[in-house]
């Protein structure tokens, strides 16, 4: 598949083995995983970091192999666990990381106003932000009146 803002193809990478159920050797139950996720979140880890810690330190390949106990038709995810326990961030993490990148790039452009390559990069990042905001408004993760404002973003990131 092609890249979003370039006319190049994507780089190939390793693929996760196709699996529909947790491995037999895995000793953790859904409750154990939920407790671990909540504990790690309270320690201040992001969802991406929680997934990495579960994989590397606890041997849990992915949380999505388990079924949600509240709704057996849905896969369990770290975000759903955090929402269930009231620990999910107000702004989704992928959007927050893009906003942080945009704020840092704006700070760079204040010091280097003629850096046109970075200016273009900022335009691309902000278009990704707008696209993601539209998606999250549609899904109900953000309020309908939420807007991305670069000045407010500085305060949001701090």
Swiss-Prot record:
One of its GO terms (biological process) is translation. Pfam families: Ribosomal_S13_N, Ribosomal_S15. SMART domains: Ribosomal_S13_N, Ribosomal_S15. Residues 1-18 have a biased composition (Basic residues). Gene3D superfamilies: 4.10.860.130, S15/NS1, RNA-binding. Keywords: Ribonucleoprotein, Ribosomal protein. InterPro entries: Ribosomal_uS15, Ribosomal_uS15_arc_euk, Ribosomal_uS15_N, uS15_NS1_RNA-bd_sf. The keyword Ribonucleoprotein applies. GO terms for molecular function: small ribosomal subunit rRNA binding; structural constituent of ribosome. GO terms for cellular component: cytosolic small ribosomal subunit. The keyword GTP-binding does not apply. Residues 1-21 are annotated as: Disordered. Belongs to the universal ribosomal protein uS15 family. Part of the 30S ribosomal subunit. HAMAP family: Ribosomal_uS15_A. This is Small ribosomal subunit protein uS15. It comes from Pyrococcus abyssi (strain GE5 / Orsay). The lineage of its organism: Archaea, Methanobacteriati, Methanobacteriota, Thermococci, Thermococcales.
């Amino acid at each position: 598949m092609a890249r979003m803002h370039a006319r190049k193809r994507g780089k190939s990478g390793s693929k996760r083995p196709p699996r529909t159920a947790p491995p037999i050797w895995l000793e953790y139950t859904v409750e154990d995983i939920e407790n671990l996720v909540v504990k790690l979140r309270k320690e201040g880890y992001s969802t991406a970091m929680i997934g990495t810690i579960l994989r590397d330190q606890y041997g849990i390949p992915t949380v999505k192999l388990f079924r949600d106990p509240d709704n057996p038709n849905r896969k369990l995810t770290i975000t759903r666990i955090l929402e269930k326990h009231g620990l999910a961030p107000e702004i989704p993490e992928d959007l927050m990381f893009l906003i942080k990148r945009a704020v840092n790039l704006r700070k760079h452009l204040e010091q280097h106003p003629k850096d046109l390559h970075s200016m273009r990069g900022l335009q691309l990042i902000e278009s990704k932000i707008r696209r993601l905001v539209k998606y999250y408004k549609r899904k109900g993760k953000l309020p309908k009146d939420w807007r991305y404002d670069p000045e407010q973003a500085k305060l949001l990131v701090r």
